[in-house]
């Protein structure tokens, strides 16, 4: 059967009677029809099959009818359409029977589906032609549109209605406010003709314009409305204006040229008083001060309250001729900011009378931003800021910000003596090369550092972030700290560009490591440092700092920049500070260093490390040229972590045995990290009855180390006695890590007699690696002091609590001098009676002394270069005067001493502890944790404090405990002894605040007193008298070693527990 019609839907209109409506197209199933009804309001309802209507003729070829369950209302329309499921249900099988009707039905359905799609397409909003540029709605409504949002969107009726309503309302509102006349009126004259006039009407009622009467309200209003009208308004900052008035608003911004200040702007008249008055006014009004001109001032401008100062542009600022000791601008209060413009000094570096400073930040939370600060100088060496030091910016405050400033042509750029501040994005230079003075810097120079951390003399700078600045062409160094004393600690120096400075780039150096002089725990990362004259990064005596990922280099520009004034081109140096303050505990990792090739004018080094460096990590640095690092001795590899391979030569020696003299012997050692690669050869020159073991030393760098592993072997041996032909020499570490012991292996047995087989032409060569334990800071404790330290109970308790060895150099009755000498911090000069040190035995020394070595002193020493022991002889029992007696350890030649010779104590323990006996040599004590308790027997407390500073400088680390001194039971409150002792302890606390033995404000002595027995009257009395409780003492002074009657604790344990707790709180041990 064919599909002979294109009709796929029928539409009818109801008459209120008819229920049957034909459909004139074929359907397969009655569900193929969709029946919809449209009511008079154009609402469309889809009817439900077998509920609202039934279908006849489905599946046939003659069409059928849709029969409604009720007549279609008059005027309602009904739509009958065919909608087939889009499926293909005919299944043809391979070699199956052919049924024509089946195929026709399938083809018919496809045709019907096409008709269905075509019908739906006819319902769409379409263009009438492919070439048309519009859509034709064919007279139909388009509904459910959104209101327009873009210019070319279609407008809905609702949108147009609302817009029209709003326009009409607005027009009505405007019209209601117009001046209207009942008849037609002429237009007003042109703008040119009506300018500055008022409207009026002539005798005919026509509009005209006239000039107002002078002084009338209309005239005033017209004048005020002119562009120049604001100049006719009177205003003064001395007046009070009501809220909301123009005057009240104008008072929020103050110009120094305003009334009543009238600051002069001619450049010569003094504006100091006017500016200070304006500042004071702004402080009281919470107003902004706007610097609108260049002003000349003759004295300091002081800001004491929160205030914002803004310069209108870079030509606005102040030129200061403030006298010596008076900074140009002083921030004496908190929350002060100065933004933009300039602050300028007289720019006279050669004047010996003009000593100027720029901006002084005494307050906190202040900001100095985008200001040009220049021209502040003070001639020559200067160690006090009382009369001006030539500093551009000096910061004494907390959390102050110095940002985006140009700090130029000053003696010092920025001096930091505060904490937790920010120095960000500044340019700092005194343009030394442009000056007539340009030469290698010395202390007579008028051009010094870009930044000086810790001030010019004994200041403190902590917690600063110094980031993103440029330091160029300063007379001394770009960033300098420590060399003037003071503290520079816990600061971050990052992302700075530091170049062309006449001394160094980053220059940190400890003058002497004291409680008030140290450089530590700074972070120096990601800086670009290049072509500074003396060194790029110089760290002298610096400790516990991080120096990572910096770029340091020299280029050929260096030669032209500093022609005739060259220094060593060193990229990065760990150097000694003053008084041999060692660089310790630093991390120097991932830096890129490139220097110039050394020639007859320049010595180029990528990295230098001093021989006192301890506990530093130097790894993963990129060095170019590779061989230009300077590491002076292999011992540095044993006490640091250095991954730069360096070769050292040495001459092997025979140790022990006899009868063999070495001839042409040599050794080569390559150190890298904790691995020492060894190659050595020995050759016998003469042999006479050889005997003993073959021990070879001394391998440099390995003394005192612990060997983790070695593979040293005999690579070659020749011309040994023929009886050795079947024996194989093999190598082991000797009594010390710096010695090699060579055995012979014969018949499976190890024989320690290889030396006996040497002949006059015997040769032996050894190669291999020795791996040592990596260096770590010692956890051992060295005790120096008087009888409080010679307590078995205390040392045993310290060992138990800290889990480490206790080396005890103390002696009961030791003076402060003896204590310092036992730590090898000081030496003394003596003369032997008779003028010489005898070949053997003892000799008395002069002079005799009081308070240096009390009677009973003894120990190991060296005098005039001779090892021995010393003792004392009491000369005067009344004064305690003693005389030293020196006894040689072994006989030798007599030594003549014309005047005096040096006397020094040797580092031997003098008191047994539970782990280390007396008489043990301990040369590495400088790496230990120190407990120092040595002032009680001093005749001069001031001398003791001074000696403590010397002892601290002698330490390799800053891990030490200073113990307060305890009173005798007679030194009650108010006595001279009590007063002097309290003064000593206060001085110890003041000079060594980080190392004085106190926890949370409670010191060792206060803690000891707090352990008294409140139920024991004797203890209560002692505490009231300011002395230690008797229940914790074993006599009139010393802490108890056993539990005393009425005691709650053992005194020595109380002290040991507190000292151990202090050490643990520092993270040093336990």
From Swiss-Prot:
GO terms for cellular component: virus tail, fiber. Coiled coil: none annotated. It is an enzyme of class 3 (hydrolase). It is found in: Virion. The keyword Hydrolase applies. It comes from the Viruses. Keywords: Degradation of host cell envelope components during virus entry, Degradation of host lipopolysaccharides during virus entry, Glycosidase, Host-virus interaction, Hydrolase, Late protein, Viral attachment to host adhesion receptor, Viral attachment to host cell, Viral tail fiber protein, Viral tail protein, Virion, Virus entry into host cell. Its EC number is 3.2.1.-. GO terms for biological process: adhesion receptor-mediated virion attachment to host cell; symbiont entry into host; symbiont entry into host cell via disruption of host cell envelope; symbiont entry into host cell via disruption of host cell envelope lipopolysaccharide; virion attachment to host cell. GO terms for molecular function: hydrolase activity, hydrolyzing O-glycosyl compounds. InterPro entries: PbH1 (IPR006626), Pectin_lyas_fold (IPR012334), Pectin_lyase_fold/virulence (IPR011050). Gene3D superfamilies: Single-stranded right-handed beta-helix, Pectin lyase-like. Structural component of the short non-contractile tail. The tail comprises six spikes that mediate primary attachment to the host cell lipopolysaccharides (LPS) and display endorhamnosidase enzymatic activity, hydrolyzing the linkage between rhamnose and galactose of the O-antigen polysaccharide. Digestion of the LPS brings the capsid near the cell outer membrane. This is Tail spike protein. It comes from Salmonella phage epsilon15.
């Amino acid at each position: 059967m064919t599909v002979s019609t294109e009709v796929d839907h029928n539409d009818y209109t109801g008459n209120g009677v008819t229920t049957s409506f034909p459909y004139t197209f074929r359907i397969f199933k009655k569900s193929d029809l969709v029946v919809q009804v449209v009511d008079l309001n154009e609402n469309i309802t889809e009817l439900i099959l077998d509920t609202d209507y039934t279908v006849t003729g489905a599946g046939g070829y003659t069409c059928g009818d849709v029969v409604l369950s009720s007549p279609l209302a008059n005027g309602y329309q009904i739509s009958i359409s065919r909608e087939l499921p889009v499926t293909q249900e005919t299944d043809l099988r391979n070699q199956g029977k052919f049924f024509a009707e089946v195929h026709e039905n399938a083809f018919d359905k496809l045709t019907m589906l096409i008709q269905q799609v075509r019908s739906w397409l006819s319902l769409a909003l379409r263009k009438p032609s492919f070439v048309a540029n519009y859509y034709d709605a064919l007279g139909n409504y388009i509904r459910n549109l959104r209101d327009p949002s873009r210019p070319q969107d279609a407008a809905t009726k609702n949108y147009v209605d609302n817009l029209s309503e709003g326009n009409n309302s607005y027009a009505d509102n405007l019209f209601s406010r117009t001046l209207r006349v009942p008849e037609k009126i002429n237009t007003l004259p042109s703008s040119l003709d009506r300018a500055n006039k008022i409207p009026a009407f002539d005798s005919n009622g026509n509009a005209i314009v006239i000039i107002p009467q002078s002084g009338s309200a209309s005239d005033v209003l017209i004048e005020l409305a002119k562009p120049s009208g604001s100049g006719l308004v009177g205003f003064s900052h001395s007046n009070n204006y009501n809220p909301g008035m123009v005057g009240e608003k104008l008072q929020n911004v103050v110009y120094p040229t305003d009334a009543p200040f009238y600051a002069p702007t001619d450049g010569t008249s003094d504006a100091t008083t006017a500016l200070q008055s304006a500042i004071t006014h702004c402080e009281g009004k919470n107003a902004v001060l706007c610097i609108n001109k260049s002003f000349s001032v003759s004295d300091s401008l002081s800001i004491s309250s929160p205030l914002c100062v803004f310069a209108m542009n870079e030509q606005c600022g102040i030129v200061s001729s403030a006298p010596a000791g008076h900074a140009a601008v002083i921030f004496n209060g908190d929350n002060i900011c100065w933004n933009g413009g300039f602050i300028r000094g007289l720019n006279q570096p050669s004047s010996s009378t003009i000593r100027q400073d720029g901006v002084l930040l005494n307050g906190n939370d202040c900001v100095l931003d985008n200001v040009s600060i220049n021209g502040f100088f003070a001639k020559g060496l200067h160690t006090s800021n009382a009369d001006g030091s030539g500093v551009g910016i000096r910061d004494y405050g907390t959390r102050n910000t110095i940002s985006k400033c140009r700090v130029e042509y000053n003696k010092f750029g920025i001096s930091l003596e505060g904490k937790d501040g920010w120095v960000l994005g500044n340019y700092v230079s005194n343009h030394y090369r442009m000056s007539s003075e340009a030469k290698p810097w010395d202390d007579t120079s008028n051009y010094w550092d870009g930044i000086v951390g810790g001030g010019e003399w004994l200041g403190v700078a902590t917690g600063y972030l110094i980031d993103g600045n440029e330091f160029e062409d300063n007379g001394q160094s770009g960033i300098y700290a420590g060399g003037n004393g003071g503290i520079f600690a816990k600061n971050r120096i990052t992302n700075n560009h530091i170049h062309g400075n006449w001394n160094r780039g980053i220059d940190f150096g400890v003058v002497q490591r004291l409680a008030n002089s140290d450089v530590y725990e700074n972070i120096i990362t990601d800086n670009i440092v290049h072509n500074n004259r003396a060194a790029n990064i110089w760290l002298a005596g610096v400790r516990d700092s991080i120096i990572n990922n910096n770029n340091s280099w020299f280029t050929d520009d260096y030669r032209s920049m500093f022609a005739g004034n060259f220094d060593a081109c060193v990229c990065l140096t760990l150097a000694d500070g003053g008084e041999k303050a060692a660089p310790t505990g630093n991390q120097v990792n991932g830096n890129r260093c490139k220097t110039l090739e050394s020639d007859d004018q320049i010595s180029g080094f990528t990295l230098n490390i001093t021989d006192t460096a301890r506990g530093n990590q130097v790894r993963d640095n990129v060095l170019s040229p590779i061989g230009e690092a300077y590491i002076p001795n292999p011992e540095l590899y044993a006490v640091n972590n250095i991954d730069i391979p360096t070769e050292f030569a040495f001459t092997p020696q025979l140790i022990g045995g006899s009868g063999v003299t070495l001839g042409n012997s040599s050794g080569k050692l390559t150190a890298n990290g904790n691995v020492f690669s060894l190659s050595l050869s020995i050759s016998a020159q003469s042999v006479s009855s050889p005997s003993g073991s073959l021990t070879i030393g001394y391998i440099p760098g390995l003394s005192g180390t612990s060997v983790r592993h070695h593979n040293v072997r005999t690579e070659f041996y020749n011309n040994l006695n023929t009886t050795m032909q079947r024996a194989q020499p093999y190598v082991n570490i000797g009594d010390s890590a710096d010695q090699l012991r060579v055995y012979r292996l014969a018949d499976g047995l190890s024989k320690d007699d290889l030396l006996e087989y040497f002949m006059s032409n015997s040769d032996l060569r050894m190669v291999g690696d020795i791996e040592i334990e990596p260096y770590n800071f010692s956890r051992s404790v060295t005790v120096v002091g008087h009888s409080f330290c010679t307590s078995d109970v205390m040392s045993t308790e310290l060992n138990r609590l800290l889990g480490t060895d206790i080396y005890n150099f103390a002696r009961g009755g030791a003076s402060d001098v003896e204590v310092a000498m036992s730590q090898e911090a000081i030496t003394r000069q003596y003369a032997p009676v008779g003028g010489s040190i005898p070949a053997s035995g003892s000799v008395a020394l002069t002079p005799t002394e009081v308070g240096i070595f009390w009677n009973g002193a003894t120990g190991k020493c060296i005098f005039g270069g001779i090892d021995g022991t010393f003792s004392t002889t009491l000369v005067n029992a009344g004064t305690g005067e003693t005389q030293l007696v020196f006894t040689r350890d072994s006989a030798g030649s007599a030594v003549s001493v014309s005047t005096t010779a040096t006397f020094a104590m040797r580092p031997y323990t003098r008191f047994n502890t539970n782990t280390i006996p007396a008489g043990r040599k301990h040369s590495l004590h400088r790496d230990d944790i120190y407990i120092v308790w040595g002032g009680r027997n001093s005749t001069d407390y001031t001398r003791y404090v001074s000696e403590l500073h010397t002892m601290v400088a002698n330490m390799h680390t800053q891990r030490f405990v200073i113990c307060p001194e305890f009173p005798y039971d007679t030194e009650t409150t108010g006595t001279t002894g009590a007063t002097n002792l309290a003064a000593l302890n206060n001085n110890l606390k003041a000079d060594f605040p980080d190392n004085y033995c106190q926890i949370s404000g409670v010191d060792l002595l206060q803690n000891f007193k707090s352990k008294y027995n409140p139920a024991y009257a004797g203890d209560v009395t002692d505490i009231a008298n300011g002395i230690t409780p008797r229940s914790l003492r074993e006599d009139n002074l010393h802490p108890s070693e056993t539990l005393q009657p009425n005691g709650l604790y053992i005194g020595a344990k109380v002290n040991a527990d507190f000292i151990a707790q202090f050490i643990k709180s520092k993270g040093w041990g336990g």
